[in-house]
């Protein structure tokens, strides 16, 4: 009897999960904006220690009467992308997958044989889930080569366009939707409190 109930619960959970969609980029942006300067967090446990520490920090640096006050022009928050804001294992780092997209799938880019060989090596390591230590350096140099000549704005536009491509191996998920929603709230909260975020 217990096995039957467990099986039914499992099947019901899978049926419900099959219909779940990721938030769109517009919805994610609204999640960040909805927090506001006062910190109305929906994806954090109210009263949790990390949330309390974050709110206390922001109160301290934004209150002109506080010893810890930081002028708005000096408020900066820098985030690591992979593993902090987006999933880093779908199947690998965002920028690595964008690099592979550029080499293999971008009709406006004509990769050299050497660039394709490097991409093949990186792709093999990514899908084997065995990235050697020196691969980070190899990939960084390769990134620089395939995006050389782009202005900052062109690179930004390219990344935004890449965000609209599906995540390989996932259903109904684009790269720009693979955002941790609690972190979207943190970014929005800091921005609403005068932080420049990177």
Model-found features: residue ranges?
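Gram-negative bacterial Sec-dependent N-terminal signal peptides
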Residues: 2-21
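Alpha-helical substrate-recognition element adjacent to the catalytic core
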Residues: 23-77, 81-198
């Amino acid at each position: 009897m217990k096995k039957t109930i467990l099986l039914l619960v499992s099947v019901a959970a899978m049926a419900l999960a099959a219909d779940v969609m990721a938030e769109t980029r517009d919805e994610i942006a609204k999640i960040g904006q909805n927090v506001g300067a006062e910190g109305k967090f929906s994806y954090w446990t109210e009263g949790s220690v990390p949330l309390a520490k974050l709110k206390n920090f922001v109160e301290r640096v934004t209150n002109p009467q506080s010893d810890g006050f930081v002028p708005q022009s000096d408020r900066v928050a820098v985030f690591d992308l992979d593993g902090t804001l987006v999933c880093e294992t779908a199947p690998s780092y965002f920028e690595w997958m964008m690099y592979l997209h550029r080499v293999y799938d971008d009709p406006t880019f004509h990769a050299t044989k050497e660039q394709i060989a490097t991409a093949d090596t990186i792709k093999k390591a990514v899908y084997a889930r065995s990235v050697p230590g020196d691969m980070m350096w190899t990939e960084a140099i390769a990134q620089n080569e395939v995006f050389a000549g782009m202005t900052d704005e062109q690179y930004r536009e390219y990344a935004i366009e890449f965000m609209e491509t599906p995540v390989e191996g996932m259903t109904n998920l684009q790269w720009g939707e693979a955002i941790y929603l609690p972190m979207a709230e943190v970014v929005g909260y800091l921005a609403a409190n005068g932080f420049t975020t990177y």
